[in-house]
């Protein structure tokens, strides 16, 4: 496998402090925007906000910096001092530690701090406990306000800090340089800044964490140095402990949270540290192994196998240590993406008033709620994969034979309260007698405590998590019964509620109530087998290989080795460029709008009669035929491209960026990205553990310290081997930049000195920059040397990919969307007897069942029917895409892909296809959906919710999430979206004798089905990705260039459509009414589109709903709705008087139509007129002239 060579680029960064404390008067404008984007619990005065230019930092803010992190002795005798600089970037979050109460809380949920304090000991995690010396020397927010001349009651203080040194502030290893204060302008306001520097400056050559920072007599302090007062602010330290360290501790299974903070800080200060960073006394969760046996961790079971469960615990802590080290490396990286600038956000363009601006931001955040819900409710989400299981040795007879898949992550959320074990497998004191929940098959409910743990026990992040969950659908769209919040609250007035968090007046907004409303979607942990990881990430490039055939005939495959051609010439002959030309011509014909690929362009004005339909279809066919023929001619004759091999190697591919500024402007979204990255790092580290353990005495006390560097190097060697793309940078200081820092002798109130010399500690930076995700286009069978288990898995997939021989319903074929949309124009008389409304379902069902009276058809009708049938049959004969086109864009791209598959002699199996589930937002569809935001609760809850619904413009956050699907991914990915998808990382060696480990990030599935997202369906031939677009919203728009199958309303309705019949519309409506009852009236056109993926039927459903409400005199009645549906069914079931019927089955089969698909070989009907397939047979080029060596298109 070829990999890109490592390239080294020199980047210049300015020297500076490791952070700032910003102090400002509470802004009069922009406060509502800042509140919406921040994470704050209503019972705390602290908050986490995003770093945004124009909102929290000034214009021109430099994201990358060479931070002062210490000092070194230089010169003869070591008498001089120079500064040690470390490249880093500023954290995408800022931490408000004073005045947070001025920001509106993210949710009205009460007592979230109490919930976190209760959950922390329940799961065994340590609480924040400042030392007495810290409290004695606290720098309070009031004191800082007084120094800055700000009113403490109206001031806002927040920390802006580099990514790698957040933990250093948490453990008081920094100080404020009060003499270096300056002023900047944010918006129209003047803001104070106080630089933050490390205490290590005053301890030359000391590159470690200072355990007792308030000891001014520390022996490492330089002679005559004026040691400053360390910066300790209790609210800030606790906020960092909860929002920064807590999530990492949960992800790494480290119950001693303070030790995680110190380990991370140590890795930041000591660039040469390679040994173990996490403490030796780390504990482990007891649980039953996934094989159903007791965990191989108890001492009595212990040493019969290879070290019993000892290796499992060792792999757990060493993988966590390696992941922490890798995260530290990424935190010191220098990235290209600038911080988000609110003045450039497209979503705010044209929004003149603060309310309108806030409403636009609220609508965008509601889009992201769909992705957050998927991460919470998917059982293989990175949020839940917190424990390590052991599959045992790959070869039971040879325990030393390494396996990449022996150790793997499993869901641990539901077993986190189990007893804790020490290194030897003994239960830790204090955990005796605790019940042990099983890894599979537990009965415990997903509760608020679990949600708190997912957020690292941070009330602020938990509040923002609830902000998103309040905007998630509880299952209405898939036919589940959603809890009636009004009734629940009313009934709870006389009963006890187990949460102990809320009162009757606040129950509607309580975290427990929100989880109860979403109960049908709670994750069900029914399997602990090794599988994919559900990750949250961001596409930061407009380029992706997500066309129907992926990266087939891509630039890299066509480029000649001698480099004799220019780039443009090569690009014009790629499959990607051919698809672009097709789409451009379709747009010129006004058939499509590339910006909205699902739209029908101006077809409504173009297709005014049946002749226009013929023209449109023929234009599409001829355009695609021409492009495909030219493409294949260029590939075969011009480049001698191995076109069949190229198809076998083609992949759908995209890259997820690790740049922190590409994530959404929200602390909770940044948490999801961080947890996803930590899960990926641990997966990679776990794959190398067995190789490190092989042949070693793992029980030795010093094994971890000795072999942690070995594991770390192995993980670093995985860079640039197919999955984790890395970048190597040479860091230099900006030209002419003076190194300004506090005087080491004059005190921290003295002005900064600019006479310092300094050097960069990490001159060469090698760090991962993106994750590459792939999905093979063709279904590939097991290789000859695959294991028996792998061959069995492939055999089980074959039936899912096997193309059936059945004839497809015309309306479910390539032209079905046009026939339904324009039926009244094409067949104006195609309506049931006694009806004035043309009905495509009735017409085509009767026609295909040979039940349509011939007298109803004119000659022109028959010619059009022949044209449609011929096209549909010919398309079906070569079709290997298990999706029917829903629009012209899909029709053209699918037809084009099928033509190329025909040239490549593909047969038998469907190819893999991609579907994007695009997150959208809308105002609450019902009063129930707005209950959590009602200004009053208790007995007045329903009235308060109705009042809110009547004045939605006054509530910028009152939006809910929704989804729509799109099967053409390139325009979706061009919007550089935030995404959620399943990721399975394969590891394998290269060529024989090569010990280089390659990886492949395989596009996989989210487990949980409709729990994760209502539009996910179980189809092995499709890969799904949830996407929330960024381009056009928070960044500039670029030019276009498996859970178990769940029977839901969505499947039921699509099954009805697939069965066909004249009464499809009424059957769909009846099934929906019976499933949803009165909630049917709440479904809007977007909901019907999401459920049915059929615009015509969606409009029919809205019409049925309107008629049902009219029949009930404005009130919903199930009887009236069913009556309307049955009347419609009766209308389309009439066939009129008996007489001669039109024989659709035989019609057209006797003619060998010349207008076939470019001479395609496929029998078009029962008459079986054979059509010669030129490429059929053992030797597709056997009839070519023997003397001609080069392959030509004519040979095909």
UniProtKB/Swiss-Prot annotation:
**Annotated region described as Required for nuclear localization, given as residue ranges:** 1171-1196
This protein's UniProt keywords: DNA replication, DNA-binding, Host nucleus, Metal-binding, Zinc, Zinc-finger
Q: Where is this region: Disordered?
A: 1176-1196
Protein name, please?
Major DNA-binding protein
InterPro entries under this entry?
A: DBP_sf, Viral_ssDBP_head, Viral_ssDNA-bd
Q: What is its main location?
A: host cell
Keyword Ribonucleoprotein (UniProt): no
Q: Which gene encodes it?
A: DBP
Function field: Plays several crucial roles in viral infection. Participates in the opening of the viral DNA origin to initiate replication by interacting with the origin-binding protein. May disrupt loops, hairpins and other secondary structures present on ssDNA to reduce and eliminate pausing of viral DNA polymerase at specific sites during elongation. Promotes viral DNA recombination by performing strand-transfer, characterized by the ability to transfer a DNA strand from a linear duplex to a complementary single-stranded DNA circle. Can also catalyze the renaturation of complementary single strands.
Q: Name one GO biological process term.
A: DNA replication
Q: Name one GO cellular component term.
A: host cell nucleus
Family the UniProt entry places it in: Belongs to the herpesviridae major DNA-binding protein family.
Residue spans annotated as Zn fingers (unnamed) read 499-512
């Amino acid at each position: 496998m070829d990999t890109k060579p490592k390239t080294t680029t020199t980047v210049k960064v300015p020297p500076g402090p490791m952070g700032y404390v910003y102090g400002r008067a509470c802004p009069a404008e922009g406060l509502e925007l800042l509140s919406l984007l921040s994470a704050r619990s209503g019972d705390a005065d602290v908050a986490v906000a995003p770093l945004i230019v124009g909102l929290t930092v000034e214009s021109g803010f430099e994201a990358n910096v060479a931070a002062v992190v210490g000092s070194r002795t230089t010169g003869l005798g070591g008498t001089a001092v120079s500064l040690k600089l470390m490249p880093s970037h500023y954290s995408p979050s800022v931490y408000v530690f004073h005045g947070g109460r001025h920001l509106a809380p993210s949710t009205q949920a009460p007592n979230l701090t109490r919930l976190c304090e209760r959950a922390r000991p329940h799961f065994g995690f340590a609480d924040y406990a400042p030392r007495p010396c810290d409290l004695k020397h606290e720098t309070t927010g009031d004191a800082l306000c007084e120094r800055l001349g700000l009113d403490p009651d109206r001031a806002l203080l927040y920390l802006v800090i580099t990514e790698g040194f957040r933990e250093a502030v948490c453990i008081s290893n920094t100080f404020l340089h009060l003499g270096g204060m300056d002023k900047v302008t944010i918006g129209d306001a003047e803001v104070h800044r106080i630089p933050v520097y490390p205490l290590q400056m005053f301890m030359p050559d000391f590159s470690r964490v200072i355990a007792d920072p308030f000891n001014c007599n520390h022996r490492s302090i330089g002679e005559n140095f004026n040691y400053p007062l360390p910066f300790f602010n209790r609210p800030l330290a606790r906020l960092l402990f909860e929002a920064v360290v807590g999530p990492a501790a949960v992800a790494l299974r480290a119950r001693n949270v303070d030790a995680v903070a110190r380990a991370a800080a140590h890795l930041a200060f000591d660039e040469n540290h390679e040994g173990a960073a996490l403490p030796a006394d780390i504990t482990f969760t007891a649980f039953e192994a996934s094989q159903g046996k007791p965990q191989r961790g108890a001492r009595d079971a212990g040493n019969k196998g290879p070290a019993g469960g000892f290796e499992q615990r060792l792999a757990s802590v060493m993988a966590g240590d390696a992941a922490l080290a890798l995260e530290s490396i990424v935190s010191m990286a220098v990235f290209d993406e600038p911080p988000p600038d609110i003045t450039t956000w497209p979503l705010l363009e044209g929004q003149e008033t603060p309310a309108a601006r806030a409403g636009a931001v609220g609508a965008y955040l509601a889009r992201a709620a769909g992705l957050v819900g998927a991460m919470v409710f998917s059982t293989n989400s990175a949020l839940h994969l917190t424990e390590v299981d052991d599959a045992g040795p790959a070869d039971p007879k040879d325990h030393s034979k390494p396996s990449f898949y022996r150790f793997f992550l499993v869901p641990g959320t539901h077993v986190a309260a189990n007893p804790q074990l020490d290194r030897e497998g003994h239960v830790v004191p204090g955990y005796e007698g605790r019940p042990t929940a099983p890894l599979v098959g537990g009965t415990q409910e997903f509760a608020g405590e679990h949600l708190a743990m997912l957020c690292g026990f941070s009330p602020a992040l938990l509040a923002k998590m609830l902000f998103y969950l309040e905007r998630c659908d509880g299952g209405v769209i898939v036919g589940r019964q959603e809890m009636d919040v009004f009734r629940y609250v009313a009934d709870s007035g006389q009963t006890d509620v187990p949460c102990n968090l809320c009162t009757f007046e606040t129950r509607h907004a309580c975290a427990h109530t929100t989880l109860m409303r979403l109960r049908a979607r709670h994750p069900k942990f029914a399997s602990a087998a090794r599988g994919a990881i559900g990750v949250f990430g961001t596409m930061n490039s407009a380029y992706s290989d997500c066309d129907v055939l992926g990266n087939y005939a891509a630039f890299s495959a066509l480029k000649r080795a001698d480099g004799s051609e220019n780039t443009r010439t090569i690009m014009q002959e790629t499959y990607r460029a051919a698809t672009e030309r097709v789409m451009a011509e379709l747009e010129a014909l006004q058939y499509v709008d590339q910006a909205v690929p699902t739209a029908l362009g101006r077809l409504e004005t173009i297709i005014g009669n049946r002749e226009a339909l013929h023209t449109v279809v023929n234009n599409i066919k001829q355009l695609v035929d021409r492009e495909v023929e030219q493409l294949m001619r260029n590939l075969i004759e011009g480049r001698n491209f191995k076109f069949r091999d190229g198809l076998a190697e083609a992949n759908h591919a995209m890259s997820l960026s690790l740049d922190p500024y590409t994530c959404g402007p929200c602390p909770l979204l940044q948490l999801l990205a961080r947890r996803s990255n930590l899960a990926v790092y641990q997966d990679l580290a776990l794959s190398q553990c067995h190789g490190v353990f092989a042949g070693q005495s793992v029980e030795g006390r010093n094994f971890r310290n000795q072999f942690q560097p070995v594991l770390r190097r192995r993980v670093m060697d995985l860079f640039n081997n197919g999955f984790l793309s890395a970048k190597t940078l040479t860091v230099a200081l900006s030209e002419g930049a003076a190194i300004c820092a506090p005087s080491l002798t004059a005190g921290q109130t003295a002005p900064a000195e600019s006479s310092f010399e300094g050097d960069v500690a990490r001159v060469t930076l090698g760090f991962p920059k993106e994750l590459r995700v792939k999905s093979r286009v063709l279904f590939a069978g097991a290789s000859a040397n695959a294991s028996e288990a792998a061959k069995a898995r492939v055999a089980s997939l074959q039936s899912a990919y096997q193309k059936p021989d059945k004839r497809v319903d015309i309306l479910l074929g390539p032209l079905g969307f046009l026939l339904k949309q324009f039926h009244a124009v094409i067949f104006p008389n195609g309506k049931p007897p006694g009806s004035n409304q043309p009905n495509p379902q009735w017409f085509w069902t009767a026609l295909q069942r040979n039940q349509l009276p011939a007298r109803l058809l004119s000659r022109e009708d028959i010619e059009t029917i022949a044209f449609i049938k011929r096209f549909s049959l010919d398309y079906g004969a070569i079709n290997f895409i298990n999706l029917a086109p829903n629009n012209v864009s899909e029709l053209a791209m699918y037809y084009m892909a099928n033509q190329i598959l025909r040239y490549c002699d593909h047969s038998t199996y469907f190819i893999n296809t991609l579907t994007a589930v695009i997150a959208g937002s809308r105002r609450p569809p019902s009063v129930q959906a707005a209950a959590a935001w009602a200004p009053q609760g208790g007995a007045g809850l329903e009235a308060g919710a109705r009042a809110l619904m009547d004045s939605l413009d006054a509530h910028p956050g009152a939006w809910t999430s929704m989804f729509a699907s799109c099967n053409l991914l390139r325009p979706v990915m061009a919007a550089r979206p935030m995404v959620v998808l399943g990721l399975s990382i394969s590891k394998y060696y290269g060529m024989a004798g090569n010990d280089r480990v390659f990886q492949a990030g395989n596009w996989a599935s989210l487990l949980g089905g409709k729990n994760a997202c209502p539009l996910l369906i179980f189809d092995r031939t499709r890969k799904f990705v949830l996407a929330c677009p960024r381009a056009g919203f928070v960044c500039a728009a670029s030019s276009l260039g498996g859970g178990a199958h769940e029977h839901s309303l969505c499947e039921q309705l699509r099954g009805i459509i697939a069965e066909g019949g004249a009464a499809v519309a009424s059957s769909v409506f009846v099934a929906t009414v019976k499933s949803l009852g009165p909630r049917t009236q709440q479904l809007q056109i977007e909901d019907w589109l999401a459920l049915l993926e059929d615009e015509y039927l969606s409009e029919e459903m809205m019409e049925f709903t309107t008629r049902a409400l009219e029949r009930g005199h404005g009130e919903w009645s199930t009887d009236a709705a069913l009556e309307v549906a049955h009347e419609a069914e009766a209308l389309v079931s009439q066939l009129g008087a008996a007489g001669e019927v039109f024989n659709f089955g035989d019609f057209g089969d006797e003619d060998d139509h010349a207008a076939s698909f470019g001479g395609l070989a496929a029998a078009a009907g029962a008459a079986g007129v054979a059509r010669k397939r030129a490429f059929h047979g053992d030797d597709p080029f056997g009839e070519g002239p023997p003397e001609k060596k080069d392959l030509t298109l004519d040979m095909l």
